[in-house]
Amino acid sequence: MTVINMTDLDLAGKRVFIRADLNVPVSDGKVTSDARITASIPTIRHALDAKARVMVTSHLGRPEEGVYSEENSLQPVADVLADKLGQPVRLIKDWVDGGFEVAEGEVVLLENCRFNKGEKKNAEETARKYAALCDVFVMDAFGTAHRAEASTYGVAQYAPVAAAGLLLVGELDALGKALCEPARPMVAIVGGSKVSTKLTVLESLAEKVDQLVVGGGIANTFLKAAGKPIGRSLSEDDLVPTAQCLMEKMAKRGAAVPIAVDVVCGKQFDANEPAVLKSAEDVADDDMIFDIGPESAKQLAEIILNAGTVVWNGPVGVFEFDQFGEGTKTIADAIAKTKAFTLAGGGDTIAAIQKYDIYDKVSYISTAGGAFLEFLEGKKLPAVEILEQRAKG
């Protein structure tokens, strides 16, 4: 995967347009989690240190195109950026047609790009206007790399130079290391409520990994496919044959989907619901499975500790409720201890990593959700493809 790395360019005095992923949660005009902003700082800092004239934009939320809305304004982000960079960050509202100056070593934040007409549809006119603002376009928003929009794809077509930022390069290197040249054994942990939303990921990983660990609602469908009772647990009956087929396919090449031997149940989905440990054979008709049991968790921890590569996307239980979080905690602890290259991504996964305090013990944490999944599926990401094309000249 060959792209131009921004660190290989002379940026002094150049107008550098950075598409970052600053789509952070905002409440009452304040950013409530600044992880994505923090992840974008090295790229912005590199451009500033190189004495570039720096412009940064991002989307935030899902505003109506062509309409300004205060609730989706990047002003709260500008405040956090200024604080983290230790210098003022002007927010520029109507920027598409230019008309503003940026000094060397200055950074401005260009208001939410989704306020602009033609952004989402990747309109050529909009993309060309973006490109006219800069000498160098830097794509650093891996989180939106799976979308071909004016600020992720179109501008890269028309800008004089199109390069990848530090965060994007880091994401691509980590994902490439985990998926293209994995140290064996390779283990993938895929959690989530529905098989249907992660079916292509499961099918793609089933061809690559040595152990495919399934968790959450997805695991219930696999439990059913393995002939185990699941009571009233969330599952997708129409996908039971698909789950059986995946397990058979993996078994044929000596790989496996480990099936839980014990589970933690409740009668209803509630923060105060008592947790009851049961053998996977003894789930009652009115039970709901909310976590894996300690024996299953121990087996999975052993698999993780002996792995060469671990890809983690999704918890294995309802970890938001502590009584149903022990399975995910055991997995997190094993990921923290293993000598394997560990790659984690997805909102729920990052929440679990933060809850169990293993952030600095994971080899690489992807900031992306959808793009991370599409990469796992083996799909080409449009925003990366255009950077590859531009690198060829």
From Swiss-Prot:
Protein residues bound to ATP: 198, 320, 346-349
Any single Gene Ontology cellular-component annotation: cytosol
Against PROSITE patterns, the record matches this protein to:
PGLYCERATE_KINASE
A family per Pfam: PGK
Q: Quote the EC number.
A: 2.7.2.3
The reply to whether Iron figures as a keyword in the UniProt entry is: no
Q: Which residues form a coiled coil?
A: none
Q: What class of enzyme is it?
A: transferase
Pathway named in the protein's UniProt entry: Carbohydrate degradation; glycolysis; pyruvate from D-glyceraldehyde 3-phosphate: step 2/5
Where does it mainly reside? cytoplasm
UniProt cross-references to InterPro entries, sorted A to Z: Phosphoglycerate_kinase, Phosphoglycerate_kinase_CS, Phosphoglycerate_kinase_N, Phosphoglycerate_kinase_sf
Quaternary organization: Monomer.
Q: Which family does it belong to?
A: Belongs to the phosphoglycerate kinase family.
Name the record gives this protein: Phosphoglycerate kinase
Species source reads: Methylobacillus flagellatus (strain ATCC 51484 / DSM 6875 / VKM B-1610 / KT)
- State the gene name recorded for this protein: pgk
